[in-house]
Regions:
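Nucleotide-sugar donor-binding and catalytic loop/hinge architecture
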Residues: 33-50, 74-79
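Nucleotide-sugar-dependent
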Residues: 61, 126-128, 138-159, 168-179
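A charged, aromatic-enriched C-terminal amphipathic alpha-helix characteristic of glycosyltransferases
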Residues: 189-192, 202-231
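Carbohydrate-associated surface elements
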Residues: 16, 30
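Nucleotide-activated donor-binding/catalytic signature segment of Leloir-type glycosyltransferases, i.e.
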Residues: 88, 98-126
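Membrane-proximal helix-turn-helix segments that form the acceptor-binding/catalytic region
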Residues: 1-10
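Conserved donor-binding/catalytic core segment of Leloir-type glycosyltransferases
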Residues: 42-61, 66-70, 84-87
Length: 231
């Protein structure tokens, strides 16, 4: 609060017009395009879809909702085989039932979908790039509501778009909510509707390059200039 009195403005990713009595300059979380490679263009395969979630996994990522939905999907005959790949460290608390969410292991065992949920562990650089190249659709945060958050501009959403992959999330992100390659799902505890996700993906006709180009305004250069020009 004391520092706010001695600056011209406060730069924020939020929607607040004033913070600690000082005016704000609203920008978005930026993207360093030079450090994020564009994924390869894949021919659309109607018989198999590979989903990819990349995170240091916590309960607010809500991957249990995706696994639950996948289990329900496979309870009936499936024309499209769907795999869920998870790349990143996973807290032990996420693997078993907790006060926050059902455990991954419990859900996988309940539905007998062991071969459809693949844990890759932490991947970086070329190994991570290869996972993106083989993926069709990415999984963002599906449970930010569990930590009391609605509006947020996550780096992961921006990385997905910069790589050129369509994705799903449940929070409010003004930079992406109306993008044609975004599937929004309810911010609640319901299982993710895999059939809806499949339909959305199959009807989508956007190349990785077009997805990436849609967020050129989110480069750090553009966002920094926005802050400077509003001083």
């Amino acid at each position: 609060k004391t520092l706010a009195k001695h600056v011209n403005a406060i730069v924020t990713f939020s929607d607040y017009h004033r913070i600690f009595g000082q005016r704000t300059i609203q920008i978005s979380n930026g993207v360093d395009f030079d450090s994020i490679p564009l994924k390869k263009m894949l021919s659309k395969n109607t018989s198999v879809i590979h989903l990819l979630g990349v995170a240091e996994v916590h309960y607010w990522h809500g991957y249990d909702r995706l696994i639950d939905g996948l289990g329900k999907y496979y309870q009936n005959p499936a024309n499209t085989t769907v795999f869920f790949h998870i790349a990143g460290g996973i807290w032990k608390s996420e693997m078993h039932d907790s006060q926050h969410a059902p455990g991954f292991y419990e859900l996988i065992n309940k539905y007998h979908i062991e071969k459809y949920v693949i844990f890759h562990g932490q991947k970086m650089n070329e190994e991570l790039d290869e996972l993106f190249n083989e993926a069709d659709f990415a999984i963002g945060s599906l449970a930010r509501h569990r930590s009391g958050i609605d509006k947020i501009k996550t780096l992961k959403n921006r990385e997905y778009a910069a790589r050129g992959i369509p994705f799903v999330y449940s929070e409010t992100d003004g930079d992406f909510d109306k993008m044609p390659y975004i599937l929004k799902v309810p911010a609640d505890e319901s299982p993710i509707d895999i059939r809806r996700l499949i339909r959305f993906y199959m009807e989508l006709d956007l190349s990785p390059c077009r997805i990436r180009d849609s967020i050129k305004n989110l480069s750090w250069k553009e966002q920094t200039m926005k802050a400077i020009n509003n001083l």
